[in-house]
Structure formats: C-alpha cells, structure tokens
Amino acid sequence: MDAIRVPIMTDATLAASRRAKVTKPFRGTYTVLITPFTPDGGAVDIPALARLVEFQIANGVDGLIPLGSTGEFLSISRDERAAIVDCVVKTSAGRVPVLIGTGAEDTREVVALSREAEAQGADGVMIIPPFYSVPTLPELMHHYGRVADAIGIPIMVYNNPATANVDLTPAMLAEISRIPNCRYVKESTLEVTRVRDIVALCGDRMEVFAGVLGYESAWLGAIGWVAVCSNVAPRLSRDMFWTAAFDADRAASLALYRRLAPLLPFVGGPRYVSGTKAAFRLMGMEMGEPRPPRLPLPPEDTAALAAVLRGMGLIADRPA
C-alpha cells in the first residue's frame, strides 16, 4: 500500500481552516473511530490510524470522532490521547470536522482534556456525563458549564445511560441546552421518540445526532448520526442517513438501510469494538485487537461476519 501523503499546513493556515469549519453547523454521518493498536496491543498504530482517516474521508463521511467508547478511550493513556488527536486532526487537515471524546469522571480532567483538544485543533468535543458518581441535574449543569466556560468550541453532550449510569432525559437536556456551548447531543437510547421530544423542548439551542438508531432518528428531526458501522461501511452509512434526513427520500433511504442492516448486530451490543476490528481484518485493513478486558471476536462470529461482508460486497467472494 502506498504511503499516505498528509498535506503540510502552517499553524496559521490550520487555525484559519478550523475557524472556517466551526462557523458551519455539524451535520451528517460522523464516524466514531476505532483506535488501531499494534499486534501486541502495546501501542497505538498511528500509521493505521492515518490510513483509517483517509479511508473515511475518501468514502464521504461528514465528520470524525476519535476517543469515544468505540475508540476504547478508557484504555488509552494521556500520551496516547495526544498522539491520536494529533494524527486525526493533521491527517484530516480541515476536510471534515473533528470532535474529540473528552469524557471523564472528574470535571477538572474533562476541562483539561477539552482544552488540550481545542489547542490541538479539534472542532468540537463530545462529553459523556461522569459515569460513576451518578450526578444530579444541578451537578450536570455545573459540570458542563465549567467545560463550556473553558473552551471556545462546541460541546456535543453524549447521552448513553447504559454506560454512564445517568439518563439525560429530554427535559434535562432542555436545561443543559441553555449552556451556550452545549449545542449538540448524541442521543444513544433505544427510545427514538426522544429525538422528537428533544427537538420540541430545545428548539434551535441544541441539535440532535442519533447514537444508535440512525435511520429512524433521521425522520424525527436528527441532523446527524454518530455511527459505529461507518467505520466499516462509510459510504453506505453516510448515504443512508443523508438520503433520509436531508433528501427525505423514503424509498431510496430504506433500500440503503436494508443493505446496511445485516452489519449492525456485529458492530453493536457488547462486541461492537471486537466486531468492528474483526471486520477490518477481513477487509484486509489490519487494526489490531481490542485491549483487555475486551477479547477478540470469537471464530464462529467471525465466520458469520465474513458472510455478511461478502453479501454487502465489502470483501471478495470465495473462489469457486
């Protein structure tokens, strides 16, 4: 494979590019990137990450989000975080917005991580609530308010009660949306009617990105989708959401969704990281294994995944 050529940009040019991006609203399909590791899992595979970014942009995704749950952010050191952000920001070079996952339990750490992300060139940050202390609404208002006061880039609030142990209901988000920088929410429950309720309660203060139900959310007012499946199938994922949310073409979007649907069980649920990395291996794009305690996808599931990828045309058919 040819080496990836990354355009060289001066600090002034990169800063100007970032300012231009921030003035535009985030919308469309944003891939929450996996983190490639070396074969022994001991280091982040930065060249593989750069190839992944190029693969995503070449296939039309609208934005990139490293260091989310799919990126195994809780298994990443502080130095590795900095290297990941540097790689994604510099490789994308202003072609698509880059949001960085900066969630942590301690508000002070979230502030520090968010400031670092902004200093490294991020266009925004995605922040899950503190996930052990089960904060109240006043505590959440204080938490997000402190971060918003510390940075000048937009915040995407991340609601995932299955992992955060706190559920940001539409009524709570209506209050959080009054914090000026909290302009987006990633809504990751399986209650798709919440998209409708957030749109109604928040108005233009906060826009909705689907976190799970991309197809369904598009019809209820979501302007974006933070997708795991777009790691593996970026063009199909992007086209499906765009055709539903912005073209309002039911027949075309449903046809695309039906093509994508067989992949979703393998990149969702408890094995979403191992399934995504196994898919890349089958596609000839090695991304390493998940870090423990996650384990690789079992062989029987890998065989089933291979059949799905063949059916989608993402890997070649077996020789007759």
Describe the predicted segments one by one.
Residues 11-165:
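Active-site beta->alpha loop and helix N-cap motifs at the rims of alpha/beta catalytic domains
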Residues 83, 87-91, 116, 120, ...:
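Alpha-helical structural signal in soluble globular domains
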Residues 149, 161-268:
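Catalytic alpha/beta core domains of metabolic enzymes, predominantly
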